UniProtKB/Swiss-Prot annotation:
Catalytic activity: sulfate + ATP + H(+) = adenosine 5'-phosphosulfate + diphosphate
Pathway membership, UniProt: Sulfur metabolism; hydrogen sulfide biosynthesis; sulfite from sulfate: step 1/3
Keyword field: ATP-binding, Nucleotide-binding, Nucleotidyltransferase, Transferase
E.C. designation(s): 2.7.7.4
Subunit structure: Heterodimer composed of CysD, the smaller subunit, and CysN.
GO terms, biological process: hydrogen sulfide biosynthetic process; sulfate assimilation
NCBIfam families noted in UniProt: CysD, PRK05253.1, PRK12563.1
Protein name: Sulfate adenylyltransferase subunit 2
UniProt function note: With CysN forms the ATP sulfurylase (ATPS) that catalyzes the adenylation of sulfate producing adenosine 5'-phosphosulfate (APS) and diphosphate, the first enzymatic step in sulfur assimilation pathway. APS synthesis involves the formation of a high-energy phosphoric-sulfuric acid anhydride bond driven by GTP hydrolysis by CysN coupled to ATP hydrolysis by CysD.
Organism: Shewanella baltica (strain OS185)
Membership in a protein family: Belongs to the PAPS reductase family. CysD subfamily.
Annotated region described as Disordered, given as residue ranges: 280-302
Length: 302
């Protein structure tokens, strides 16, 4: 009897699970980066499947900046309690003491100190030699050329010209002392794949992904939602209630909402089939300087 042919999503799922299992077996101290977004939620679901009925054999790490949406933090804590995984939350203590924030210090400095340097601190503190990330190649041009096994030097820096070939699904995980890798099990997924898989597997998400009436201010052509009293308004700016949702999530002053009526998974998938805009157009950190994402990744960013 001929074997049943796998669907597109089943093939992606099988590939990702194989990568997760291989890294868990090959490396001494792996960790999964958990940003609380939709891609992280899918990656967490895949990790749970990979080791079911056992528990995930490595911790999840959230690099907090102090500026995440309140709904994201509540969702993070609820997921950890529900599934019983080990959750590590790290915030850069020096940046916190200096009061680094996106309003007074700008997006580039805030991202470097609170996210990039914060991540490197946590990786060094716990001695992780492999870190799973939820990046996909269709997101952004610098990520399009990144390998599944993305090698980093002892300072966690990425050199795109010094990476290893990956033939078919054969990965070389040998690293020298002090070096590490970032692993991207979702590399071959698209944004639409992610949403269809979320629908198929009934994966829980932060409610911010779904359209609702929210208080936003228009700034530079982008809609920014006020999540707490720290939100600073420029002269002439005022809040207005709009029906919006978030296509991607990050620090709330640096993440723009979009007009949308998609308040269900079915409507979001329909919206994805029709959209022609970039998923990351709402991430202000991607446009704070030329070739911004690649520069950040070279310095140790996700």
């Amino acid at each position: 009897m001929a074997g049943r042919e796998l669907s597109h999503l089943q093939q992606l799922e099988a590939e990702s699970i194989q990568i997760i299992r291989e890294v868990a077996a090959e490396f001494d101290n792996p960790v999964m980066l958990y940003s609380i977004g939709k891609d992280s939620s899918v990656m967490l679901h895949l990790a749970r499947k990979a080791f079911y009925p056992g528990k995930i054999p490595f911790p999840l790490l959230h690099v907090d900046t102090g500026w995440k949406f309140k709904e994201m933090i509540a969702f993070r804590d609820a997921q950890a309690k529900k599934f019983g995984f080990e959750l590590l939350a790290h915030i850069n203590p020096e940046g916190l003491a200096q009061g680094i924030n996106p309003f007074d210090h700008g997006s580039a400095k805030h991202t470097d100190i609170m996210k990039t340097q914060g991540l490197k601190q946590a990786l060094n503190q716990y001695g992780f030699d492999a870190a799973f990330g939820g990046a996909r190649r269709d997101e952004e041009k610098s990520r399009a050329k990144e390998r599944v096994y993305s090698f980093r030097d002892r300072h966690h820096r990425w050199d795109p010209k010094n990476q290893r070939p990956e033939l078919w699904r054969t990965y070389n995980g040998a690293v020298n002392k002090g070096e590490s890798i970032r692993v991207f099990p979702l590399s071959n997924w698209t944004e639409l794949d992610i949403w269809q898989y979320i629908y198929q597997e009934n994966i829980e998400l932060v409610p911010l992904y779904f359209a609702a009436k929210r208080q936003v201010v228009e700034r530079g052509g982008q809609l920014i939602m006020a999540d707490d009293e720290r939100m600073k308004l420029a002269e002439g700016e005022q809040f207005k209630e709009e029906l919006v949702r978030f296509r991607t999530l990050g620090c709330y002053p640096l993440t723009a909402a979009m007009h949308s009526e998609a308040d269900s998974l079915e409507k979001i998938i329909e919206e994805m089939l029709l959209t022609r805009s970039s998923e990351r157009q709402g991430r202000l950190i991607d446009s704070d300087q030329s070739a911004s994402m690649e520069q950040k990744k070279r310095q140790g960013y996700f």
